[in-house]
Amino acid sequence: MYLTIWLVSILALGTWGQKFNRFCHYNSWALSRNPQHGLVPEDIDPFLCTHLILGFAEIDESGLRLKDPNHYQQEYLYQRIVRLRRINPRLNMILSVGGWDKSQEGYSKLVSSRENILFFTKWIITYLRRHDFDGLDLDWEYPTFKGSPMGDKKKFVDLVENLAYEFDIEEIPDIKWKLTLTWTADPLESVRTSAYDIKGIASKVHNVNLKMYDFHGHWDDPLQVNHHSPLTSPNSPRNVNELAKSWVKAGVRIEKLILGIPFFGRSFTLKTANMSVPGSPAVGPGSDFGDGIPIHNLCHIIRGGTKELYLPEKKVPYIVSGSEWIGYDNPRSVMEKAQLVFNNALAGVMIYSLDMDDHHGTCGRKWPMMMAVIHGLNAYMEYIDSKHKSLELTFNKKILRARVSLRNYRRRNQQEKVAEMEQRIRHLEQELQQSMGNMAYERQQAQAMLNRGVSLPPIEQQSWSW
């Protein structure tokens, strides 16, 4: 069922030709996960996302620059991430500054003076260009919170205005695109009214990324089990649908609005094991100790026999294992959230985070959550075509380089090299022809699947059994 926020049917009719942004977070600590679940940049499918957000860079003690990436051994990580553009030249690379534990002191220092803001604005452009990033994401969590002065709310707007202005007027002859500026924000009313001048910020950035998760957790008081990212809810405004509506009413244009989708669950330890319905009392976080449980872990729990339960009024699943209660998203629920974006012509989705999906396919097919999002956005054929065009372009580049080498060898009368290069060109042309045949078949199969229709699986069907 398609949900509509504003109930304007003519709007939904216009979305079929629209391409939706797919912002995907990739966290630097993804490399430190155990070998079974770690995700190195080279294993990322660069066509799954339109934008890859690398998190998180940290503002240094002076408030004027970012900390040296070597401080986090990230210099090489930057290079490895950006190298994905060799496979998909259209992939946008965004550097995110801040995050939950790296925001407050640095941002407050940065905006503490006009001089700091002006210096940082010039400096960050050079930094982004040097590391081959396409844009900057501001993830300050949050102005006026955790010791941040009340004046930081207005000063954050000043920072955004200066960045937007300098990004816009930047003129470099060999650069064919302008830098992108995005803002990642907490959608909850309690944060929104205190921390943000929504109109002031949203009018200057290209996209507003709403963190549509962590609405509930072990920090709640009183502490009760509740799903942290419900799509809808009849009894609380803390749900994706209502919060999206509230931000549009607050002044964010729908063509800028990006909805965050979590690829992790939040756990609680029940006070009484046999009292597990939502709203039951809890005594603290579960086995994740408050860090969140990635989908690539949850799928094994479910495949191991733990029964998946469903909250029809919230359109999200949860499980109970002993005294542990875990609310999470599965392929069905993220597809439905993506359909909300599609049906209302929003700008797209933000995935948090790509490295939490079952990217190795240990529970079935690879990237089950990401593929569900792509289907929900009706973007599967776009995904297939992008991969095919890139592969064809790669082969043609190899053939062109080989032919240039062949001409040089002939000019030098290096007959042995000529024979080797002629054989290489024949092999490349054969591989290209075979690949084109495979691509045509794959596209035909994809179109047939889409013609049959990709529907939501039955509620009673357990995830990762499809």
Swiss-Prot record:
| CDD domains according to UniProt | bZIP_YAP (cd14688)
CC annotations in GO: extracellular region
* E.C. number(s) listed in UniProt: 3.2.1.14
Q: Which residues form a coiled coil?
A: 408-442
Give the matching InterPro entries.
Chitinase_II/V-like_cat, Chitinase_insertion_sf, Glyco_hydro18_cat, Glyco_hydro_18_chit_AS, Glycoside_hydrolase_SF, Glycosyl_Hydrlase_18
Q: What PROSITE patterns does the annotation carry?
A: GH18_1, GH18_2
Annotated compartments: Secreted
GO terms for MF: chitin binding; endochitinase activity
Query: Do you know which PANTHER family this protein is assigned to?
Result: CHITINASE, CHITINASE 11
> What is the protein named?
Putative chitinase
- The record lists the organism as Pinctada maxima
